[in-house]
């Protein structure tokens, strides 16, 4: 499929996903004032017709197709340099789609446990790339009492868990919290939040499901106030991104979308793999923020003579 336009991206989010913000059900993100700024920011990642950005934003796949560079597996120093440069220009929606690199990083290890899981990882990466989709890093559980293991909590759903397995797939229940841009992606890529022991096997789960999958609900929050005006909020009026509390209310996931289902020794491998790519984005953001602070300090000193 061809690369999406900004308008096609926004239209693709009108898929019946269940979203809430301040207790209000959001039926259409394209018509919601709360999502106006985040959508404007995220849709710029689809401006492939910008001649100044197109070369950086895209690459040729092994089949010769044009794809977004966020899906490129860096194999040379130049590949990595371009990826890092791209990361400084992307929105949070584009940035967190790097979760597919975390999956690719564990693919060989998980193949030794279950080759089908590795094949599923490859297939979902190719599917998302071919359809120019975006994905969220869905990892942080509610956790509850941090001194207890996942299976020792008073509420068993404080960590996302498998509640049923069948010949067709798994059913999961629980929630993941503080998920950046969850409401504005197409795929929710779920990983364990930490290493798991044998008694916690039901909590050792990884998969990808559509954001509009039955049983998925996303409760949004943001640092940006509900009513923005450029004078009082010069930054938030142009750049903000919500985070979501993603609730999985007995969500069914077919086996072809599952990457881990009870193999507890692999849970920590998944959790650590995400850190490599997530921390890279964090460091790039820290460097940009440091430049802003230095610039502000210079401006203040100049104003004070």
Where are these regions (language model features)?
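Structural beta-strand/beta-sheet cores of well-ordered domains, especially the beta-sheet scaffolds
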Residues: 17, 133-135, 168, 186-188, ...
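Internal helix-loop-helix
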Residues: 47-135, 187
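Gly/Pro-rich turn-and-neighbor structural signature
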Residues: 106-175
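Short, surface-exposed, low-complexity cationic segments
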Residues: 30-49, 183-193
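N-terminal-proximal low-complexity accessory segments that begin disordered
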Residues: 1-43
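Glycine-rich beta->alpha junctions and the first turn(s) of the following alpha-helix
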Residues: 229-305
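Buried hydrophobic positions in well-ordered alpha/beta secondary-structure cores of metabolic enzymes
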Residues: 23, 172-174, 248
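A short core secondary-structure module
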Residues: 175, 179-228
